[in-house]
């Protein structure tokens, strides 16, 4: 039995092998499709035979027409300090290479990204890019498709930091225009011609973007030839997009604190003139706080020569805050001057009364002698000279007393009377808010229109 069993074992294995093989084929067929036919696939080795990737299609003839299309994935960062923005885009390029045409089928062939290294590619680059890189997670983010007539679609994902010249004169009430310039690096217009794809009527993705500081209001496409004397003309395609700054965050962070500081400085107008420490400390605190706010707001901006709208508003508020402090100094000076003047009047008034009484006494004592001399002079028909001199002296002294008397008619001090300190505060309560409101109307009209 043992010998018979060993003889039958190979036969049993042969009988069972087709059954297991059919089951395996069925499992694979259920997964990949049992009716898969790839007879239409072109012979890539035959297409690439004699292919020279270092030469453009149709070299020596008409230039290659390259259609470009953009799809924006994100705009990650816009920096005013560095005048740049970071954008991630899908760049689609399409051109025809007749050397790769296969006309026996209408199927489009999707190729592995590694096949890109074997093809001729347009040398497109971003002109105003500061830095750029390709994405390679989990594989290189490149797509290439080959159509039967030799048309190649090449798509790549690029993240680039691009320069953007900004005019910050109206910051933060400004609108900026940034560009993305695409150009051939080595091929002139005699070898390659760029044009926007017919499907590029709008940039996909821009309508879904949510930027923290800006809103994209519009965009447009341009095509131009750049002239270089030493190299010729090079085609350039540009995407221009308008950015309007979102003003809400700046109103909350910069404008409203400045307005509140100015209003806080007006509180001193309702504080008594006698409360010197309170009014001085309030004025100095508002001035220093306004200075700190100005410095912190400017730290995130470039040191540009242009005066920005935010700087103008900060200086307007700074002037009003400082003027409120100066107003108290002026009012306090007037109050102190009035006190000293009243004290001086009280001292000089008794002296003036004493001088008048002394003059009356002297006049009474000399009245008898003057009368006798006057009688003698009348009999002789003349007026004594010393009497005329006395009259003139009295007249001059009277004029002096009238002109120099405090508060007298025609006096200089009567025309320059110091204003009461409380009256100055009352005027300031109305003048400062009205002037600040008028300046704000002019400011917002000038920078928002």
Swiss-Prot record:
UniProt KW Signal keyword: yes
Complex formation: Heteropentamer, formed by a combination of alpha (GABRA1-6), beta (GABRB1-3), gamma (GABRG1-3), delta (GABRD), epsilon (GABRE), rho (GABRR1-3), pi (GABRP) and theta (GABRQ) chains, each subunit exhibiting distinct physiological and pharmacological properties.
Secretion signal span: 1-24
Glycosylation sites: 103, 106
Name of the protein this chain belongs to: Gamma-aminobutyric acid receptor subunit delta
Main location: membrane
Domain topic, free-text comment: GABAARs subunits share a common topological structure: a peptide sequence made up of a long extracellular N-terminal, four transmembrane domains, intracellular or cytoplasmic domain located between the third and the fourth transmembrane domains.
Transmembrane segment boundaries: 252-271, 276-298, 309-331, 424-446
One cellular component term from this protein's GO annotations in UniProt: GABA-A receptor complex
GO molecular function: chloride channel activity; GABA-A receptor activity; transmitter-gated monoatomic ion channel activity involved in regulation of postsynaptic membrane potential
Localization, UniProt: Cell membrane
Keywords for this protein: Cell membrane, Chloride, Chloride channel, Disulfide bond, Glycoprotein, Ion channel, Ion transport, Membrane, Phosphoprotein, Signal, Transmembrane, Transmembrane helix, Transport
InterPro entries linked: GABAA/Glycine_rcpt, GABAAd_rcpt, Neur_chan_lig-bd, Neur_chan_lig-bd_sf, Neur_channel, Neuro-gated_channel_TM_sf, Neuro_actylchol_rec, Neurotrans-gated_channel_TM
Membrane side Cytoplasmic: residue ranges: 272-275, 332-423
Residue list for modification Phosphoserine: 390
Function: Delta subunit of the heteropentameric ligand-gated chloride channel gated by gamma-aminobutyric acid (GABA), a major inhibitory neurotransmitter in the brain. GABA-gated chloride channels, also named GABA(A) receptors (GABAAR), consist of five subunits arranged around a central pore and contain GABA active binding site(s) located at the alpha and beta subunit interface(s). When activated by GABA, GABAARs selectively allow the flow of chloride anions across the cell membrane down their electrochemical gradient.
Gene Ontology biological process: gamma-aminobutyric acid signaling pathway; synaptic transmission, GABAergic
Pfam families: Neur_chan_LBD, Neur_chan_memb
Topology term for the membrane: Multi-pass membrane protein
